[in-house]
Regions:
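Bulky hydrophobic/aromatic packing residues
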Residues: 10, 195, 247-249
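Short hydrophobic alpha-helical runs that function as membrane-insertion/retention elements
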Residues: 9-12, 204-208, 231-234
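C-terminal regions of RecA-like/P-loop NTPase motor modules
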Residues: 212-305
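Long, positively charged, glycine-interspersed low-complexity recognition regions
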Residues: 199-207, 227, 246-247
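P-loop NTPase motor domains
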Residues: 1-7, 14-16, 20-203, 216-219, ...
Length: 305
């Protein structure tokens, strides 16, 4: 669909030549300090995911990371050209230079992503983000980098939201497999915060998932649901229905509309209104041929496009 609409598909894989730099920062009208504060929040979350372990980073460790972050952007703030944008490697070097055993542990955790086989995100961004429709494809990124990739893409979208806000343009953001961002506490807390920030800054975020159970079991789910006006439910299994009834307050009658329901039918929750719906997508259309994923219907999507 993105190709048919002349959008840009960015494939993020270990062997890809398309790069996203997690250190990219979007300067706002509020000045460097405000932008850096938001960026620091993201990078600390990234480090927490990599080096935090079961209990997460301690506050003193986060404080040292924050201090290092403030220094490595000095060159870029003095002359904000692309080649002066810091890399993950600059953070790694700054942490080592701090000569603190606790921080050295964090730096050692970053080695794999800076000098090791998973250093895909240690490059300057070379993706042209000028297209109005962009798709970041992380399907082949691998388990080691997938969660990091989702977090980094989310931050790249935030940079676009921030940029578009200056131009008074709304930004629509669709995140598939959204439950993965809520699986780990570190990424879940940040994702809820970015969800709220998107809405406040003119973004229109939409999370999609087939793993409703995992999604609703997250400790941070209330922060997502409380900041979402619209919920779209299709057919659900019995186990997930019980969770939906508890989290969304659905009655047995309402749940019947997502029990063994046909494709294109289910429930819409809008504010405090619950609406059953049937939406049969016409199969004789170009968009159906492009978006159809049923293997039994051998459709040549290239011909459709």
């Amino acid at each position: 669909m993105v190709a048919a609409l002349h959008g840009q598909v960015v494939k993020l894989t270990i062997n890809s030549k398309d790069y996203l730099n997690p250190m990219d920062i979007q300067l706002s009208h509020k000045g460097d300090k405000e932008a850096l504060k938001l960026k620091s929040d993201f990078i600390i979350t990234l480090c927490d995911l990599i080096a935090g372990g079961k209990d997460g980073l301690q506050n003193d460790e986060k404080g040292i990371i924050d201090e290092c972050i403030r220094h490595i952007y000095d060159k870029y703030f003095e002359n904000p050209v692309p080649e002066n944008m810091p890399l993950l490697e600059d953070l790694y070097d700054a942490l080592l230079a701090h000569k603190n055993p606790k921080v050295e542990r964090i730096a050692n955790s970053l080695v794999l992503y800076v000098h090791g086989s998973q250093n895909y995100f240690n490059h300057h961004t070379n993706v042209d983000s000028g297209n109005r429709i962009m798709c970041f494809d992380i399907r082949d990124l691998g388990n080691q980098l997938k969660e990091l990739g989702m977090l980094i893409v989310q931050d790249a979208v935030w940079n676009r939201v921030s940029q578009n806000r200056e131009r008074k343009i709304a930004t629509r953001y669709y995140c598939d497999e959204f439950h993965l961002l809520l699986k780990e506490k570190q990424t879940a807390i940040y994702s809820v915060e970015i969800w709220k920030r998107f809405r406040k800054w003119g973004g229109i975020p939409t999370g999609l998932t087939q793993n409703v159970g995992d999604f609703l079991r997250s400790e941070e789910i209330e922060g997502i649901l409380g900041n979402s006006d619209f919920v779209y439910l299709l057919n659900q299994n019995a186990k997930d229905q019980a969770i939906l009834a508890d989290k969304l307050g659905l009655s047995d009658k309402q749940l019947s509309y997502v029990t063994n329901s046909e494709p294109g039918s289910g429930l819409i929750l809008f504010d405090n209104v619950v609406i059953p719906f049937v939406d049969k997508y016409p199969t004789d259309t170009k968009t159906y041929r492009i978006m159809n994923t049923k293997p039994e219907e051998s459709v040549q999507k290239e011909d459709a496009i």
